[in-house]
């Protein structure tokens, strides 16, 4: 079983975790001008 040889400092652990970001979903402008989330059915036009 893998065990760390030395303790990982708070700074080093934080530097590694900087890439664990949550990306916000970008709304897409539909044909009728309304915005919808990607891969969702538009409630107004009932289109995907």
Curated annotation (Swiss-Prot):
Protein name in the entry: Large ribosomal subunit protein bL32
Entry's Gene Ontology molecular function annotations: structural constituent of ribosome
Record family assignment: Belongs to the bacterial ribosomal protein bL32 family.
Pfam family, any one: Ribosomal_L32p
Taxonomic lineage from the root: Bacteria, Pseudomonadati, Campylobacterota, Epsilonproteobacteria, Campylobacterales
Keywords: Ribonucleoprotein, Ribosomal protein
PANTHER family: 50S RIBOSOMAL PROTEIN L32, LARGE RIBOSOMAL SUBUNIT PROTEIN BL32
Gene Ontology process terms (BP): translation
Organism this protein belongs to: Campylobacter lari (strain RM2100 / D67 / ATCC BAA-1060)
Gene Ontology cellular-component terms listed: large ribosomal subunit
Region (Disordered): 24-48
Source organism, top-level taxon: Bacteria
